[in-house]
Amino acid sequence: MKIRSICFLAAVVQLLPLATSYANAAGESGVASVYSTESGGRTASGAQLNPGALTAAHRSFPFGSRVRVTNRRNGRSVVVTVNDRGPFVRGRIIDVTPAAAQALGFSGLTQVTVERE
C-alpha cells in the first residue's frame, strides 16, 4: 500500500506541470487591475518598477514570460512581459502597468483574457 501511494504521488508530481502549462496556454479570464506606482520600488524579479513599460504581475507565469492581455470590453490587446508576482486581491488575475492599461483602454479594473505568447 505504501509503495502504491509513493508511485501515485510521483506520477502526480510529474504530470502537474503539464496540466498547469496546458491551462496557461489555453488562457484564463478574469479581472485585471492597474499597478500602483506609488511605491516606485523593485518588482519580485528584481527589476525597477517602470510605469511606462509594458510589464505585468502574474501569480504563476515565469518571469520573462510574454503574455497577451485582451480587454474583453473593447477588444484591445497588448503583449506584456511578466516581471512581478501578484495580484494579491481575490478575483484578480493580472496587474498591469499604467502604460499597458492605457494601451488596453482602461483605468481601474476591467475584464480580460490572458494567454501566453
At which residue positions do the language-model features occur?
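Secreted/periplasmic proteins
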Residues: 2-117
